[in-house]
């Protein structure tokens, strides 16, 4: 049984098997319109720029934001202002100074600073001061329920099965993007080590 045909004149049909691939083709040329660093994954796009002065950084980002706005208009897409914001990255001392306030505008509105001074990019929480305590806290909270599940079944399933479950449920989360945040403070690393030791103890004593 086949559904009836329906023309799709704008955008990409959602729920289709080829939808993700078609969408990537649809936005493929966006990065070529920009003259700053641009990272894309699915429908998320991150632009970044740096220079010797905040004024120059603001100018570069504002110009590229306008290019994005024009590209979206040409492709009949609409920007969501609530999901579009900026984050200023630097040392804690620099961020506290007045010089850290960079004004970037796009499509007639001023981009607001990220809430909590952090952004989650592909599952990694990046803080504006480039510390990782927030990400480590997120990892710890994510693993709490998983560890509780392993604890309940530790005497029910065989050792090899429990080992496989722990590697899939816990280790995969611990090592995800580890080279990126592996240089965090020692106290944060100890928190992760405690989790790893706890799971290892559950598995070996099963």
Residue map of PLM features:
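Short, conserved non-catalytic motifs in the polymerase core
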Residues: 1-22, 48-54, 109, 113, ...
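Active-site palm subdomain of RNA-directed nucleic acid polymerases
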Residues: 3-5, 20-49
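Catalytic palm subdomain of template-directed nucleic-acid polymerases
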Residues: 11-12, 28, 46-73, 91, ...
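Mobile genetic element proteins and their domesticated derivatives, centered on retroelements
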Residues: 15, 19, 23, 30, ...
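Hydrophobic packing residues in well-ordered alpha-helices of helical domains and bundles
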Residues: 38, 58-61, 65, 79, ...
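Short, conserved micro-motifs composed of acidic
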Residues: 63, 77-117
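Short, charged alpha-helical motifs in flexible N/C-terminal segments and linkers
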Residues: 69-88, 94, 120, 188-206
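Basic, alpha-helical interaction scaffolds
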Residues: 109-182
């Amino acid at each position: 049984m086949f559904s009836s045909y329906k023309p799709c004149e704008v955008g990409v049909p959602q729920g289709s098997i080829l939808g993700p691939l078609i969408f990537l083709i649809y936005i493929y040329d966006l990065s070529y319109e920009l003259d700053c660093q641009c990272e894309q994954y699915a429908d998320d796009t991150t632009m970044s720029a740096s220079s010797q002065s905040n004024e120059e950084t603001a100018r570069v980002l504002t110009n590229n934001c306008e290019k994005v706005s024009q590209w979206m208009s040409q492709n009949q897409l609409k920007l969501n202002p609530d999901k579009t914001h900026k984050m200023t990255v630097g040392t804690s001392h620099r961020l506290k100074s007045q010089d850290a306030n960079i004004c970037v505008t796009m499509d007639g509105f001023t981009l607001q600073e990220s809430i909590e001074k952090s952004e989650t990019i592909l599952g990694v929480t990046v803080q504006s001061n480039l510390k990782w305590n927030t990400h480590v806290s997120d990892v710890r909270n994510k693993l709490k329920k998983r560890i509780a599940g392993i604890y309940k079944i530790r005497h029910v399933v065989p050792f090899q099965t429990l080992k496989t479950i722990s590697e899939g449920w816990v280790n995969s989360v611990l090592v995800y993007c580890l080279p990126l945040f592996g240089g965090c403070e020692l106290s944060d690393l100890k928190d992760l080590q405690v989790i790893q030791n706890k799971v290892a103890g559950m598995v070996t004593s099963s």
